[in-house]
Amino acid sequence: MPVELTYYGHACFGLKGGGATLLIDPFLTGNPLAAVSADEVEADYILVSHAHGDHLGDAVAIAQRTGATIVGNHEIAIYAGNQGLTAHGLHIGGGWDFPFGRIKLTIAHHGSSFPDGSYGGNPCGFLLTIEGKNIYHACDTGLFYDMKLIGEEGIELAILPIGDNYTMGPKDALRAVKLIEPTVVIPIHYDTFDVIKQDPTDFARAVEAETKARCLVLKPGESYSL
């Protein structure tokens, strides 16, 4: 069965597969490029890579409305639990087999603090195995050589930031593709703010010229079936 992915802008994706609906980093309210409002999305699980407002976003409000389980690092799980929400906490390198598939937390070189400035735990990326397909959502990170180890899992889809300034930019993202060797790449985390303006088509051309991967540039609201 295919995994259906919908890009909602910035780093946010909705995924349907394994009999569940997942939402990753739901920064919708306050996102000038968001394809939907927080009231329009559904979720059984909400994955939060770190506590910055442009990733934690509407996670709490959506979970309160839908009853979704929040999945993230231990500190984010405690934060969600303190608000009466169901949460599953992990740490980097740890994984868990959920009814729909497996989630494993990967390294991400970034920061993490809640909107009030309190410590948000270590940021992470997500390695998802759903319907037998391996999806790597790098979330906010700089380039790191251990991406090669992630690639050894056999990655069908890599979702990589290209915005620069807060994350790796297009040149380092291209190097990441060469380390991971995925089948398909989708660039994210660009154009939301002036400081991360990029041309994703330039990145796509470089990926397809220098690697075997196919690069898919999705506009907010567009979908892809894996």
Positions of the model-derived regions?
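Zn-dependent metallo-beta-lactamase
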Residues: 1-21, 28-31, 97, 104, ...
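Active-site-proximal loop/helix segments of hydrolase catalytic cores
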Residues: 113-179
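Binuclear metal-ion centers of metallo-dependent hydrolases, dominated by the metallo-beta-lactamase
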Residues: 69, 81-94, 174, 178-226
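Active-site environment of divalent metal-dependent phosphoester hydrolases
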Residues: 30-31, 52-57, 77-80, 94-97, ...
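Glycine/small-residue-rich loop that forms an oxyanion/phosphate-binding "nest" at active or ligand-binding sites
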Residues: 49, 57-114
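Pre-active-site segment of Zn-dependent metallo-hydrolases
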Residues: 14-52, 57-61, 75, 111-119, ...
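Short active-site oxyanion
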Residues: 4, 64-69, 133-135
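Active-site neighborhood of phospho(di)ester-bond hydrolases with catalytic His/Asp-centered motifs
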Residues: 23-26, 43-51, 71-74, 135-139, ...
